[in-house]
């Protein structure tokens, strides 16, 4: 559809995720059951899962918090080059991001930090809440959004990709203090196969 997560972002009590791996889905479902049924929070979930077959790795250590907040560091490529980029991907496109990191490393000597973004929407919510707090507390210590904390000590421009239109990942632009480029499936209807789409 290319835009359903953007529609979900307009509903305040909708918690939406676009996970890639089975362990991400498990963490999200467990937390969702706890919040909705045990804590009785007035929320509901919108979770997208794709119909592609691919290997699912083991869950990285200490990934749970990042999975629920919206992003976590999945992998770093290490070369002897001086150039580094931040690659953000969600859903099935994360696998394309991982492949892109390999190409950048092997063919161009560019290192990458690969981030799995389970929810651009939750990251945006956190960014907006942080912005609001800073606006209402001008004399207090300025807070930083979760995405700012993740990326502030990382080098290089940020490239964000998803299986949705560019404006989905572009929601992070105000909270990233680095050159930011978003990629998506704009023009989806013109692609006859998944290979051509990607």
Name each region found by the language model.
Residues 21:
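Ferredoxin-type iron-sulfur electron-transfer modules in oxidoreductases and energy-metabolism complexes
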Residues 1, 9, 16, 24-28, ...:
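Thiamine diphosphate
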């Amino acid at each position: 559809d290319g835009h359903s997560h953007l529609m979900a972002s307009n509903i305040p009590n909708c918690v939406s995720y676009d996970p890639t791996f089975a362990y991400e889905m498990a963490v999200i479902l467990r937390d969702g059951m706890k919040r909705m049924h045990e804590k009785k929070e007035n929320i509901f979930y919108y979770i997208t899962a794709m119909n592609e077959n691919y290997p699912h790795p083991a869950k990285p250590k200490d990934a749970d918090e990042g999975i629920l907040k919206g992003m976590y560091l999945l992998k770093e490529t290490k070369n002897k080059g001086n150039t580094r980029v931040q690659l953000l991907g969600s859903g099935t496109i994360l696998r394309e991001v991982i492949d892109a990191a390999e190409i950048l490393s092997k063919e161009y000597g560019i290192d990458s930090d690969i981030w799995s973004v389970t929810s651009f929407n939750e990251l945006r919510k956190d960014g907006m809440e942080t912005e609001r707090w800073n606006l209402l507390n001008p004399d207090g210590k300025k807070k930083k959004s979760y995405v700012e904390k993740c990326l502030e000590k990382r080098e290089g421009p940020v490239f964000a990709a998803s299986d949705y239109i560019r404006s989905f990942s572009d929601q992070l632009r105000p909270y990233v203090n680095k050159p930011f480029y978003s990629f998506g499936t704009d023009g989806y209807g013109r692609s006859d196969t998944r290979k051509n789409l990607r």
